[in-house]
Amino acid sequence: MQKSISFFVIFSILWGSLFLFSIIGSLGTTPIPLTKDSKFLMSSILPQGWGFFSKNPRDTAIGLYEAENASAKVRWPNMRADNLFGLYRYGRSQGVEMGVIYSQVGKEQWTACKEKDLGACKSKAKTVQLKTPAPRPLLCGSYYLTKEDIVPWSYSKYTPSSYQVKSIVKVVISCSKT
C-alpha cells in the first residue's frame, strides 16, 4: 500500500511539473523566467505547444443554406442526436465538401450584404455554376454560400441570429454520381 502511494505521488509530481513547465514555456515574459535552454528543452519535448487551442473567435464562418428555404442544409454541429452524437460522419463529410466548393468560388463572385435578413441578401446574390469533384457527393443542387461574422455574446440578445451575413453567393452544384 505504501509503495503504491509513493508511486502515485512521484508520478503526479512528474506529470504536474511537465504540464506546468509546458505552460510557462509557451508564455511570454512571466514572473517565473525560464532559461533559453529550458525553453528549448520544453519545445523539443512538447513541440506543438498550446497554439492549437487559440482559434480567433471572431473569424469569419461559412454558411450553407438551401435555395428553397432559409434552413441550413448542413448537419452541424457533429454532436447532435441526428448525427448519432458524433458517430455518424455525414456532417463531417458535408463540411469537407463545402470547403472544396467554397475554394472554387472566386473573390469577384461574392456579393456584399448589409441587410440583416438572409432573404434580402439572397435576392442580391450572383449565381455561380460549379461541379463538385467529390467521388460520392452529398451537396448537389442550388444553395446559398455565405460568409458570416459571429455576433459577440454581449450583443446576441439584440439580434435574431448568432451570425450576421457579410457576403453571399448562389452556387448551383452539378454532381456526377458514380
Curated annotation (Swiss-Prot):
Origin superkingdom: Bacteria
InterPro entries linked to this entry: Sporulation_SdpA
Organism name: Bacillus subtilis (strain 168)
Pfam family for this entry, one: SdpA
Designated name of the protein: Uncharacterized protein YitP
Keywords: Membrane, Transmembrane, Transmembrane helix
Main location: membrane
Gene behind this protein: yitP
Coiled coil residues, start to end: none
A GO CC term assigned to this protein in UniProt: membrane
Entry membrane topology: Single-pass membrane protein
Lineage: Bacteria, Bacillati, Bacillota, Bacilli, Bacillales
Subcellular location: Membrane
Positions of transmembrane segments: 7-29
